[in-house]
Amino acid sequence: MKLGIVGLPNVGKSTLFNALTSTQNAQAANYPFCTIEPNSGIVPVPDARLDKLAEIWQTDKKTPAIVEFFDIAGLVKGASQGAGLGNKFLGHIRECDAIVHVVRCFDDDNIIHVVEDVNKPESVDPIRDIDAIDLELILADLEVVSNRLGRQQKAAKTGNKAAAAEAGWLAELASWLEGGKPARSFDFDEGDDAQKAVRKELGLLSAKPVIYACNVGEDDLLGGLDENPYFPLVAARAKEENAQAIPICAKTEEDIAGSTQEEKIAFLQEMGIESTGLDKLIKASYELLGLISFLTDGKKECRAWTIKRGTKAPQAAGKIHSDFERGFIRAQVIAYKDLEDADFNYAAVKSKGLQRTEGKEYVVNDGDVIEFLFNV
């Protein structure tokens, strides 16, 4: 799973990336385009269930699910026409499965802000900033859709019914984009396989699912968000788009990223919060794409495996090894909650009949602890 961290220059993208990866790989500087080529980093998905199983088994190896993040260059007006690093920026987004849009929600006169409002110079306006990036993605999509629409309209004139059908919904989509609305909020026909195939081919940038990472000040973490005038605006926008808005102080997260687990716990207790903004962001990113984890356990290794929600047992087994799917016989399944309720007494779980035998049609649930039986 690949997620692109995007935003206007100087909103905290590289600082957030450094915190996510606990590195200083991304140059964080107060000027546009300090990121040119995207930095990438593999980030583990926090999972207390996996941590507990590893503790119980005293396992030799613990392997979490992962997310790959890309720190993508800052965007400026005109990127869809190649301004700034526009073409590279848009190409890098196209390669990602989803977008983490970092939005500035703090005041600091020392930080340059690239997008200016003639009526409010150097002002902080997260909705304006969101619209600035959305517009460039929408314009890039409109060009792609218009080109395809022109070809299909031409083919439709020859009596090609499939082309005529495609031209119909493409025209509606083009009109939607022309209205300044992203493709992610367009009413696609999810039951139309032909439409799905075209959408995949088009690779629409503004159709990619998005999480808004609201970069707030440290004072907002200490005093709560009640006094922050910007976060509620982004949260409302996210609700309209069926997206998520997560408050995070990128600089603070970067400062504690290299701390020990004990130090992080002490920090959270001092701040009066349950989890870091990074943990919330990583989990939200994982869920954004409809992903879940099933678990395998044992002394040799405890591991979280990533699958799409709705995956059946044989295909889940195939994530471990293709032979597991090819020779699938059955799966021995324990729900993590049942294991937890039994104080991780495996014998008690089995004696109560809570270890289930499931076949090829079983749909794997998040947190299932599974042993696969196969024969090839």
Language-model regions, residue ranges each:
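Flexible beta-alpha connector loops of hexameric P-loop NTPases
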Residues: 75-81, 121-124, 131-137, 156-162, ...
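Non-catalytic accessory segments flanking P-loop/AAA+ NTPase cores
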Residues: 121, 138-140, 178-182
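C-terminal-of-GTPase-core extension/linker across diverse P-loop GTPases
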Residues: 2-6, 11, 17, 151-365, ...
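Conserved G1/Walker A P-loop phosphate-binding module
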Residues: 1-121, 127, 134, 151-152
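Alpha-helix boundary/capping and short turn/kink residues
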Residues: 105, 139-142
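Conserved phosphoryl-transfer catalytic core
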Residues: 142-149
